[in-house]
From Swiss-Prot:
Protein's cellular compartments: Cell membrane
SUPFAM superfamilies per the UniProt record, alphabetical: F1F0 ATP synthase subunit C
Transmembrane segments: 3-23, 44-64
Protein name per UniProt: ATP synthase subunit c
Family designation: Belongs to the ATPase C chain family.
Site location (Reversibly protonated during proton transport): 53
Organism name: Caldicellulosiruptor saccharolyticus (strain ATCC 43494 / DSM 8903 / Tp8T 6331)
GO molecular function terms listed in the Swiss-Prot or TrEMBL record: lipid binding; proton-transporting ATP synthase activity, rotational mechanism
GO terms for cellular component: plasma membrane; proton-transporting ATP synthase complex; proton-transporting two-sector ATPase complex, proton-transporting domain
Keywords annotated in UniProt: ATP synthesis, Cell membrane, CF(0), Hydrogen ion transport, Ion transport, Lipid-binding, Membrane, Transmembrane, Transmembrane helix, Transport
Length: 70
């Protein structure tokens, strides 16, 4: 049962992967349209990607804790 719970916890990684993929596509599209805005787009993208990736890291930690029964 705990393995199922850990698997469900890791479903957050699916959403994060899709979200970061969409954000990357939009950032690349924005830079393609306005190359002079590269300096403003890239830092915002990295901040957004880091915040989204934090969700995946938290779900991974929760899954590990569930499997190890800590």
């Amino acid at each position: 049962m705990t393995a199922l719970a850990a698997g469900i916890a890791m479903l957050a990684g699916l959403g994060v992967g899709i979200g970061i993929g969409i954000a990357t596509a939009k950032a690349a599209e924005s830079v393609g349209r306005q190359p002079e805005a590269y300096g403003r787009i890239l830092p915002l993208f990295f901040i957004g990607a880091a915040l989204a990736e934090a969700v995946a890291i938290y779900s991974f930690v929760i899954a590990i804790l569930l499997v190890l029964k800590v």
